[in-house]
């Protein structure tokens, strides 16, 4: 399995498409790598004792401008992977649900909606 941050900042869309092609969608897991400033307005925040500047969906270290993490939630990553990276919606949803459950060995209980499984539902607009 490969975990991939599809926020449009960490990895170029062409590289995401290439990773899906090389690995196969059943081995891809969408993650957000979101830091504590996720959902907050632009400004300066602290992450692990380091000063971080957030502008839009970019979080960079104040000290040297290096990428400091993501300020994008998983729903936004789903939108980005479908709209900008041209991954089919059904595939993207599997990469955020059943694939992580399989990676953790809990797919019999989580990761999809079926009788006997625990239902975790989110309603999002893509």
Q: How would you name each of these model-derived features?
A:
Residues 124-126:
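Conserved small/polar residues in nucleotide/adenosyl-binding loops
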Residues 1-8, 15-117, 121:
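His/Asp/Glu-enriched, well-ordered alpha-helical/loop segment
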